């Protein structure tokens, strides 16, 4: 490769990445998932588009795809709160194993019939498209405020179902390559346990060692993110090399790092955010370049039928069976999880496996997988806002600062600076600072008014459009948000929880005269205990129950227990 070729590569890569970034603004305007924009840019630059770039190197696509997925999952794991496992771990694992197997079987049967393949070849297509995609799920759910049970289940499922899909795909490729048509159940179970066991063990063990290394190393601040990423990739590669799931390993590594005190945590998350965007852009650009629309047209109708079968039948059936043991999922939540079976880069990367193995019909497998992913992203991704409203799984977004940054003062304390802009409707407008009931341990460190820095004192009165800088901890965000945050723009309205928020510790006998309640059978219970008894374990914000003509909604949680309960009349619509 000469200097001119290398420079041309830099030129084309910079143009494609820049175009993807600029065109990403169309995503919100047109209601199209941003990943489709990246994919479309790659296809337009490809051999059938105006760009005319011929790209058919599946090994490079495999390399880029795995590298990008590893970074995306590391970032996703670091942003996942381990507290969400309280409500979603076992349901997500059920969907990641039983759900993927059922989806693979049902989709494989349909694929064999639609494309006139034998059963094993059809099952290979089912395995390739059988898992949800972490990149798509993290990207499309990241901007939506869904109830924790639903969002955590989808995110943990997408981060942990790839071992099952990889296991099924590799096993079926080996069967087809050796012309065997029977499978040894014991061998399959051993391989599956190897994928999950090594992935979980090395991911958590390696993550703990990486955490100790990061916190003990004395480095320049900008080097900690590089150490985190390189360590995560090392764990990913080592796990894959010994036959485990590297994808699961790096996700668990990120989960462990994100939930422990970590040196230069804020800088690391900021760098990872940029790397994740670059990974998504690069991965979908390469996959778009790899696709040839003229090769998709001959299989468009059967591939569309397969995609609709998977979306409308295979995925819902697998979700309802996978969630059967978990009674706290409402039917509307099950339907929404069924609909958000987003396919993305993982099926396309898995479709590269048969190409690299030289299997017959390998190009067909790739084209079908690409078409199914395209339909899933466009149909399911674009309808996600509507589906979340219809299923009523959205909850009001918690008030948040307009900016936050870490203060590397003490490794264990994790101090942060939160920046708030005051709006007209905040009750604190006109109040002196001394009258604010700030959370214990927080302090206003700066006040900006009309672009000037003021020196606040206890007598300083707040005005609209003031910008406050507050030092505190992440645990202080709910209380600070109630004081200072602007209300997020959303369609849920201010009365989602009701006109009144009641303390969960309130006794029902005290509430009875206020709301005309008959509490003769539950007079000795608190409101929170009664709601928990009605709704079951693992409550999340947004859970509600109808009782005596009123809707009682969990409005705030504290360490797994309801803290505040909203109440509204049955005929009121919160949407």
UniProtKB/Swiss-Prot annotation:
Its main location: membrane. One of its GO terms (molecular function) is flavin adenine dinucleotide binding. It catalyses: K(+)(in) + H(+)(out) = K(+)(out) + H(+)(in). It is found in: Cell inner membrane. The keyword Iron does not apply. One of its GO terms (biological process) is cell volume homeostasis. The keyword Transport applies. It is a multi-pass membrane protein. Pfam families: CorC_HlyC, Na_H_Exchanger, TrkA_C. One of its GO terms (cellular component) is plasma membrane. Residues 404-486 form the RCK C-terminal domain. Keywords: Antiport, Cell inner membrane, Cell membrane, Ion transport, Membrane, Potassium, Potassium transport, Transmembrane, Transmembrane helix, Transport. It comes from the Bacteria. K(+)/H(+) antiporter that extrudes potassium in exchange for external protons and maintains the internal concentration of potassium under toxic levels. Belongs to the monovalent cation:proton antiporter 1 (CPA1) transporter (TC 2.A.36) family. NhaP2 subfamily. This is K(+)/H(+) antiporter NhaP2. The lineage of its organism: Bacteria, Pseudomonadati, Pseudomonadota, Gammaproteobacteria, Aeromonadales.
């Amino acid at each position: 490769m000469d200097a001119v070729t290398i420079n041309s590569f830099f030129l084309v890569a910079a143009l494609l990445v820049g175009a993807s970034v600029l065109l990403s603004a169309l995503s919100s305007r047109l209601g199209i998932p941003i990943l489709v924009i990246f994919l479309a840019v790659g296809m337009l630059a490809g051999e059938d588009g105006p760009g005319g770039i011929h790209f058919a190197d599946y090994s490079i696509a495999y390399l880029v795809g795995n590298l990008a997925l590893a970074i995306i999952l590391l970032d996703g794991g670091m942003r996942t709160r381990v507290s969400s496992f309280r409500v979603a771990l076992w349901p997500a694992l059920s969907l990641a194993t039983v759900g993927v197997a059922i989806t693979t079987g049902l989709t494989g049967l349909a694929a064999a019939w639609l494309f006139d393949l034998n059963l094993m070849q059809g099952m290979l297509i089912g395995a390739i498209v059988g898992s949800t995609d972490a990149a798509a799920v993290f990207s499309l759910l990241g901007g939506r405020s869904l109830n924790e049970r639903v969002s955590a289940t989808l995110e943990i499922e997408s981060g942990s179902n790839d071992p099952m899909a990889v296991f099924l795909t590799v096993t079926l490729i080996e069967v087809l390559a050796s012309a065997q048509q029977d499978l040894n159940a014991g061998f399959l179970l051993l391989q599956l346990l190897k994928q999950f066991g090594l992935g979980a063990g090395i991911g958590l063990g390696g993550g703990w060692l990486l955490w100790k290394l990061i916190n003990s190393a004395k480095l320049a601040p900008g080097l900690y993110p590089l150490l985190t990423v390189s360590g995560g990739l090392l764990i990913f590669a080592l796990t894959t090399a010994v036959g485990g799931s590297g994808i699961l390993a790096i996700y668990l590594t990120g989960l462990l790092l994100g939930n422990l005190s970590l040196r230069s945590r804020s800088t690391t998350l900021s760098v990872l955010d940029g790397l994740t965007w670059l990974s998504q852009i690069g991965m979908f650009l390469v996959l778009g370049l790899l696709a040839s629309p003229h090769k998709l047209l001959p299989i468009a109708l059967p591939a569309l039928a397969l995609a609709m079968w998977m979306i409308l039948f295979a995925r819902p059936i697998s979700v309802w069976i996978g969630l059967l043991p978990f009674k706290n999922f409402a039917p509307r939540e099950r339907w929404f999880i069924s609909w958000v079976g987003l396919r993305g880069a993982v099926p396309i990367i898995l479709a590269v496996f048969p190409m690299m193995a030289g299997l017959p019909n390998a190009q067909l497998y790739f084209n079908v997988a690409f078409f199914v992913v395209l339909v899933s992203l466009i149909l399911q991704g674009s309808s996600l806002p509507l589906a979340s409203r219809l299923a009523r799984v959205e909850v009001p977004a918690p008030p948040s600062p307009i900016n936050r940054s870490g203060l590397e003062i003490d490794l264990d304390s994790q101090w942060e600076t939160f920046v708030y802009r005051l709006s007209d409707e905040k009750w604190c407008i006109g109040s002196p600072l001394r009258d604010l009931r700030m959370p214990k341990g927080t302090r206003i460190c700066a006040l900006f008014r009309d672009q000037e820095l003021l020196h606040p004192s206890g007598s300083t009165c707040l005005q609209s459009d003031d910008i406050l800088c507050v030092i505190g901890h992440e645990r202080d965000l709910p209380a600070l948000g109630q004081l200072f945050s602007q209300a997020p723009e959303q369609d849920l309205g201010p009365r989602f929880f009701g006109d009144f928020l009641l303390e969960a510790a309130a006794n029902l006998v005290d509430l009875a005269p206020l709301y005309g309640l008959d509490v003769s059978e539950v007079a000795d219970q608190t409101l929170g205990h009664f709601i928990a008894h009605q709704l079951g374990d693992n409550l999340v914000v947004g859970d509600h129950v109808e009782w005596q003509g009123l809707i009682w909604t969990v409005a705030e949680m504290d360490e797994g227990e309801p803290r505040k309960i909203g109440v509204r009349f049955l005929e009121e619509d919160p949407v």
